[in-house]
Amino acid sequence: MSRPTVLAAAEGKKDWHVLRTSREAVRLFIADMVHAVRCVPEALAEVRGSLHPLRAKQALETVFAELLLMAAFGLYLLLRLPAAADLYFSIMMPAAIFVLIAFALFVQSCGGDVTFGLIVSTLIVLGIVLQLMLTAYAAYAGATSPRRFLVIHCVSLITGLLALLFFRCVLRMRAVHAAVFLSLLTAACYLILFVFGSAPAGTNARAWLCIGPLSLQLTEIAKVLAAAAMALVISDTDRSGKARLLRSFAILAANGVFLAALGELGTLLVLTLVYACLLFVFCPDRTELRRATLLKMFGAVAVILVCVAVFSAVCLRASNGAKVAVIREVRTAAPAVDGDTRTIDEKIAAACARDKEAAKTCAPLINRVGNEVWKVCRRVLAMKKPEGLTDEQMLALGVDNYQLRRNNMAAASGGWFGSSYEMDRYTMVVAESDFVFAFVLRALGGVGGIAVLLMTLALLICGNRRLGAVAGRAEMAVGYAFLYALVGQMLICIAANIGLLPTVGLPMAFLSRGNANSVISYLLVLFILYAGRRPQKEVSR
């Protein structure tokens, strides 16, 4: 037999072997999916079995704590906006009892982190309060339906429990098969948006699927599926470190292509942050984050933050010293020097001109960092003037985005403790969703904004503490992915609302209004709480 004939026969055998291997892989994948479907009753029984009955005293303490939380926020509304308080007590509070008490009892029954659950309950009530306070705006009067908002919370809690059961079944598959299955569902969401997706007026992101009066932001669902797929791949111990790294990056890159085509760069930013955090946790071969490692990590972060703060102060002084001095003078209403007849706008324009001159003598990095730090300083300095900045002054300071400009003007007028007068002086844009943190600064002031930021960081710390001790590696990985997606999106939304990042159009968990956002928020926290549950023996102690 000639050599070409032998080579042709060998190639044919190789092709047949590849085809047979592919068929076998597909068959195993389908068999794994069928097994996961058949395990639904078993997974449901497992979830029910992990919920232990509560003692009467424990249940009463839980109910009393939730009622006290809602009463405290109701009293705050009664003092600030009596009209909104009437809606709160007559419509929102009765149904919120069913949502909050059911959620709190689930946390206690499954042995979840009580602190984590209490923070989530506070965010839920705060979201209800903010949506009701929006009714004080003439532009939002009638736009926020309390009954509809309440129904969304009830349905979202039930849907979140069903989604928790879905992921419990998916985790019964092999890690690689589960990742492929979730990736296929993610691709299906993107294809549906390409064919049937729509974009709100004034945006280019085709992220919504409208079915009659109902609209769903499918990219929120795709984000969760993609994050879980990356977590399963990157935590798969059956693969080498290089293979896990490349496959997880391939999932991120594929999602990046779809999201860029849809115009959803904010969701891509969240997934990138989740990917980076998962790499930090799982690329070293360790099954959990030990407390010592976690303390070292926070210590390193603290040192880095101190260095960044010092460097930022130097950059701010070098690149924006003139602007800071003049704006501080404007905000404190300092008396003008004799013979100084310049207006406020002229002073700001002169400060900006001196800032540009200083930039010519600074290194590009120093000037860039100084301008970013200035965005934060502008917010702090503006708090000293109750009516905030005018539209012309915001333009003079370089804020040319209309939505960000209007919302920053309104946020600056909130001061440190919020302001309820002249609610229509600044027409806020998308304050119920994407710019809800700007409305927090407007209605609750800087203190309220700091409280929301601290609660977000507390979610990260509590979640890390519990998830680091989870026995199942796949469950721990998905829990970490959900935690970083939840907290990461909240931090990105906060940064975008105060001008540290470009406008990304992302909602905040529990504070923003939205169908898909509400469902996904409940799913994320329920999965994190259930994954970090303690055994019944530990709970009963």
Regions picked out by a protein language model, each given a short descriptive name:
Residues 427-431, 439-442, 482-486, 510-514:
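Transmembrane helix-bundle signature of multi-pass membrane transporters/permeases
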Residues 61-65, 409, 462:
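Polytopic transmembrane helical bundles with strong interfacial aromatic enrichment
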Residues 264, 268-269, 416-421, 431-433, ...:
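Transmembrane helix boundary and interhelical junction motifs in multipass membrane proteins
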Residues 86-399, 438, 442-499, 523-527, ...:
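Hydrophobic alpha-helical transmembrane segments of multi-pass inner membrane proteins, especially
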Residues 29-99, 119-120, 126-136, 191-196:
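N-terminal signal-anchor transmembrane segment
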Residues 2-57, 69-78, 473-474, 489-541:
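A juxtamembrane structural motif centered on a specific transmembrane helix
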Residues 398-447:
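Long extracytoplasmic/lumenal interhelical loops at the membrane interface
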Residues 5, 13-24, 28, 35, ...:
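Coil-to-alpha-helix initiation sites in intrinsically disordered, low-complexity, charged segments
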